Amino acid sequence: MIKTILKNSYIQKEITTHSATVIFSHGLGDSGAGWIEVMEEIQSRNNGHIRFICPNAPIQAVTLNGGFKMPSWYDIKSLSSRGDEDPAQVDESKNIIETIIKHEMEEEKIPAERIIIGGFSQGAALSLYTFYSQTETKLGGCIALSGYLPLATKFVANSLNKEQPLLMIHGDCDQVVRHQWGKLSFDHLKSQGINGEFITLKGLGHHSSPEEIDLMTKFISKTLPK
């Protein structure tokens, strides 16, 4: 399974000494290729010891887009509400991320606390769910860009990662994943005792920006120092 997952992932291999890993998941309809240049930019800022892995989501039907098949971590039925995600599909995609984590720990000998998971939009949602579902693996941290917590109405953070750092960034002009959804998800997690920061970027829509990349870089460099 891991060979197939890694074969279908974009991996930055030009590193000095591999002592840390960032696993970053793309949004709906995108691919890992859409983020590898951003990861290379972050790596170039004195983060040559970090390997960046950008996995590709499975191709599956998305109700929101009339059943059209596209890269998707799980089905999305509507943009009007949250919490109607398919638990089985969310868990299947969580298993993909967990398989990569296990590979980095066992084959690359990277300690769990030297691994950050993160993503954009649906990939951010998957990362939040995966991060706070861990009961045996204490990771380094989590990054969620323009994201939200899936299955939020049923989700309870029962995780070793409650004390680990979370960075959530959301634009206040996001018309796809509303800013309020991200903030509500953060508040829900915060009420359960997680250690995190929510940053609002003025004028930012449903995309990234140089300011956001700067914030990501600082978080990654601080969490995964040489």
Curated annotation (Swiss-Prot):
Protein name (database record): Acyl-protein thioesterase 1 homolog 1
Assigned EC number: 3.1.2.-, 3.1.2.22
The protein's role, per its UniProt record: Hydrolyzes fatty acids from S-acylated cysteine residues in proteins with a strong preference for palmitoylated G-alpha proteins over other acyl substrates. Mediates the deacylation of G-alpha proteins such as GPA1 in vivo, but has weak or no activity toward palmitoylated Ras proteins. Has weak lysophospholipase activity in vitro; however such activity may not exist in vivo.
Top-level EC class as recorded in UniProt: hydrolase
Catalytic activity field: S-hexadecanoyl-L-cysteinyl-[protein] + H2O = L-cysteinyl-[protein] + hexadecanoate + H(+)
Listed GO CC annotations: cytoplasm; nucleus
Keyword Signal set for record: no
Catalytic residues identified in the record: 121, 174, 206
Pfam families, A to Z: Abhydrolase_2
GO MF annotation, one: carboxylic ester hydrolase activity
Family: Belongs to the AB hydrolase superfamily. AB hydrolase 2 family.
GO biological process per UniProt: fatty acid metabolic process
Alphabetically ordered keywords of this record: Cytoplasm, Fatty acid metabolism, Hydrolase, Lipid metabolism, Nucleus, Serine esterase
